[in-house]
Amino acid sequence: MDSPPKKNPMDDLFGEDSDNDSRSSRSKSSSSGNASSSSSSSSSSSSSSSAAGGDGEGDGGGADSGSASDSGSGSSGGKEEHGDDKVESYRSNDNGESGVYPYEEEEEEEEDEKDLFGSDNEEYTKTPAISTYSIPVLPAGWSNDNHGGRGGMGRGRWSNGRGGPGLLPRPGPYPGRGGNRGGFGGRYQNYQRDERFVSELKLSKSKETLARKQTNFQEPCELTCYSRVEGGEVIYDDQGLRLFKRHIGEEIGADLNQGYDTFIEKKDLGSEGFGDLLGSIRAKNISLDNIHFVTFRNNLNKILGAAYNRHEPWEMGVHKRNGTIYLDVHKLPERPQSDLDRRRCYWGYCFESLATEDPGRAYGEEIHHVDANVEFCSVVRTKLGAHRVMMGAEMDCCDVSDKGKRFYVELKTTRELDDRTVDRFEREKLLKFWIQSFVAGVPYIVVGFRDDGGRLVRTERLTTRDIAHRARLKNYWQGGVCLAFADEVLCWLYGTVKENEDYILQFVHPFMRLELLQAQSCPDAITNHVHLLQNPASPPPPPQ
């Protein structure tokens, strides 16, 4: 009897699991009928897994992540799949000779098949259209004034100068050490509060406490999209979306320096890029009545990542209009880039060109004319905890399942790993990869590993759900901690900022608190957007 014909692995890069993964959360949600029963939660018993990257929103774009041992050149990269007893090495190359990924079919239980990111605590949940939660009310701020209330009389907890010392010294600088911050002195005694200070959120909760908090995260739903084409024109369609090349393994050994001389670097559009996102929302007449936050993905990456990343400063604009908070991307000053820095950045864009279909490039033809300003942005709606978020996220490319379902794919470039760099890669870079992909609902990440000279050494496909599983197994980080932390931040923000006022949210040294500072102006992109929503026929006000 003739054996059944074997399926050519080159015909399908992602295999059947791609369709299962991309539709899993929806099938799970539609079959349950109860949003709360399908909600994702981060609990201590199941050790959730977790979190951040640049779009035109600042997610990192095609920037190469640089050396795994470097502190910050470019974006981060890569993941491998983990099981309880078997672990595939990051250094293994299963591509073989075929030049195509050997994506074997994954045998999963029926429940796992229904869930895009597995049955862990970071699964997506469906939630009702109207929130049942009221706007959070913040407790009264903590005060250093201990003269009133409990302990103000007698020999109580604090010393009061009567009848001998108290059981504990009064909070404040240690004697003889100066400073103006309660009880710290030494390292923190020179901390000076910004005169624009409005409020702060101290990062006092432990990761164990956050891990026990149940935080729902709704599966992102795409509402619209837009493209930026050559010349900078913005078109409200998917013209700029590229198709993933399933035979990327054929590019192993390619020089990522090709085309560097004609590279067009990405322009810093500032708030103008945010205006393009808001314009796409208006073009589709999408209501913001029940939306608490509008932002680029990059700002959510920063917030979720701060649960673990306590050494990278950042800030963002915070502007509340008509009950919706607009988070504007702010870029902090950077050190001047060397030629090597620019090349590493280009290697990421070059890999994106190699990994996507280009009808205009003949087989074997080198990459040329790479324009970092050409991009495609998806606009999605999701819900984190009690707050609905509308978010713009730049997407590298897409692929299509056997059943015609389109899904997005993230492309990353990073230095080849060795025994010294694997640990940091899993602790830090995979955390950023997971956040960037998870919050936008991207199921797959394809990583190009390169050597120090910019030559492509190997490629590897990672699934977003398995990144979280692996990190949890090794106790590196938990996705649920990042979600719980972000929920705390959004609750604090929404309950603190006032209507028609402008702020800056910053996270700076010594990285012990988030600070909300008063700002003096609102970007024209937001002002014009609000005006056009209320008066579609009238021209926007002149720039400030």
Curated annotation (Swiss-Prot):
Gene Ontology terms describing biological process: nuclear-transcribed mRNA catabolic process
Record region (Disordered): 1-121, 136-188
Binding-site residues for Mg(2+) 2, renumbered to this chain: E352, E394, D396
Reaction(s) this enzyme catalyzes, per UniProt: a 5'-end NAD(+)-phospho-ribonucleoside in mRNA + H2O = a 5'-end phospho-ribonucleoside in mRNA + NAD(+) + H(+)
Comp. bias (Basic and acidic residues): 1-10, 78-91
Residues noted as binding substrate in the record, renumbered to the chain: E272, F296, R297, N298, C377, E394, K412, Q436
Protein's name according to its UniProt entry: NAD-capped RNA hydrolase DXO1
Family designation: Belongs to the DXO/Dom3Z family.
Composition-biased stretches (Acidic residues): 103-114
Residues spanning the signal sequence: none
Organism, scientific name: Arabidopsis thaliana
